[in-house]
């Protein structure tokens, strides 16, 4: 009896020490695929956007003088990501944009939120591998929810930073995004 117990312990340990078979999951980086012409165009557009953003954010990080929120590096980053993603979604380029971000992303892909739920979060994750942008994990989540909340209100990119500052704290915006709430004035504008 004792021998059987020892034997089963050994086989369990051996089974645990074996490498697991590769399982394809949606949150893991996809296997390299051959891009379609639309995806190649989107990837070139994304690379150009990423490079321009890194240069501009780097320029805005120079100097220690106080700036209004609109002119800070973080304000510029939010505004440009918002502008780019809204433009691509309005042109119905969501599928190729998602593929492009998956290709640009280093590491695991998020399970939540999905690209459909929050494309801004995914775009910020795609930019995370750029050291010039210095994006932290908490900022990605917070900025993604702020941009999604602004998109629900159809805020023009130029007014984005002001809208975020006027609507309240990040905690309040998080709650409103989770509850699918809108600002009280939104329904009165005929939207």
Regions found by a protein language model. Give the residues of each.
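Intrinsically disordered, low-complexity, charge-dense segments enriched in Lys/Arg
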Residues: 169, 173-191
């Amino acid at each position: 009896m004792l021998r059987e117990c020892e034997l089963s312990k050994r086989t369990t340990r051996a089974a645990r020490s074996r490498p697991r078979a590769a399982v394809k999951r949606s949150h893991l980086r996809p296997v390299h695929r051959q891009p379609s012409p639309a995806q190649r165009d989107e990837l070139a557009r994304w690379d150009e956007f990423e490079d321009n953003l890194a240069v501009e954010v780097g320029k805005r990080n120079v100097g220690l003088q106080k700036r209004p929120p609109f002119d800070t590096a973080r304000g510029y980053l939010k505004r440009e990501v918002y502008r780019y993603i809204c433009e691509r979604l309005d042109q119905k380029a969501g599928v190729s944009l998602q593929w492009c971000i998956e290709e640009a992303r280093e590491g695991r892909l998020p399970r939540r939120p999905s690209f459909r739920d929050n494309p801004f979060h995914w775009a910020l994750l795609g930019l995370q591998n750029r050291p010039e942008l210095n994006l932290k994990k908490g900022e990605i989540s917070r900025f993604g929810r702020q941009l999604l909340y602004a998109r629900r209100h159809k805020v023009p990119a130029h007014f984005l930073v002001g809208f975020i500052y006027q609507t309240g704290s990040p905690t309040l915006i998080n709650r409103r995004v989770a509850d699918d709430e809108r600002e009280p004035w939104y329904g009165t504008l005929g939207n």
